[in-house]
């Protein structure tokens, strides 16, 4: 019969503490890539919609993660991560 593991390892920090640290890291990264006015408007929208709740914090984290992912995927000029679009040569010299 299957038994649960006896040792779960070291206890993780509380969820709320970890969540707030994650939000702070995402905000710090977002201000390096997006206009402050845009981020302020997003924060106001989240606050007006969810108030000062954990649901609002989780929503803000999800939106910032999505924005940063798309930003890097498109090709951020501040990062080496992303798609580097190469110009196609019309003379056919790149063909083998």
Swiss-Prot record:
It comes from the Viruses. One of its GO terms (cellular component) is host cell nucleus. Keywords: Activator, AIDS, Apoptosis, Cell cycle, Host G2/M cell cycle arrest by virus, Host nucleus, Host-virus interaction, Ion channel, Ion transport, Modulation of host cell cycle by virus, Phosphoprotein, Transcription, Transcription regulation, Transport, Viral penetration into host nucleus, Virion, Virus entry into host cell. It is found in: Virion; Host nucleus; Host extracellular space. HIV-1 lineages are divided in three main groups, M (for Major), O (for Outlier), and N (for New, or Non-M, Non-O). The vast majority of strains found worldwide belong to the group M. Group O seems to be endemic to and largely confined to Cameroon and neighboring countries in West Central Africa, where these viruses represent a small minority of HIV-1 strains. The group N is represented by a limited number of isolates from Cameroonian persons. The group M is further subdivided in 9 clades or subtypes (A to D, F to H, J and K). During virus replication, may deplete host UNG protein, and incude G2-M cell cycle arrest. Acts by targeting specific host proteins for degradation by the 26S proteasome, through association with the cellular CUL4A-DDB1 E3 ligase complex by direct interaction with host VPRPB/DCAF-1. Cell cycle arrest reportedly occurs within hours of infection and is not blocked by antiviral agents, suggesting that it is initiated by the VPR carried into the virion. Additionally, VPR induces apoptosis in a cell cycle dependent manner suggesting that these two effects are mechanistically linked. Signal peptide: none annotated. This is Protein Vpr. It comes from Human immunodeficiency virus type 1 group M subtype F2 (isolate MP255). InterPro entries: RetroV_VpR/X (IPR000012). Homooligomer, may form homodimer. Interacts with p6-gag region of the Pr55 Gag precursor protein through a (Leu-X-X)4 motif near the C-terminus of the P6gag protein. Interacts with host UNG. May interact with host RAD23A/HHR23A. Interacts with host VPRBP/DCAF1, leading to hijack the CUL4A-RBX1-DDB1-DCAF1/VPRBP complex, mediating ubiquitination of host proteins such as TERT and ZGPAT and arrest of the cell cycle in G2 phase. The gene is vpr. Its main location: virion. Residues 1-42 are annotated as: Homooligomerization. Gene3D superfamilies: 6.10.210.10, VpR/VpX protein, C-terminal domain (1.20.5.90).
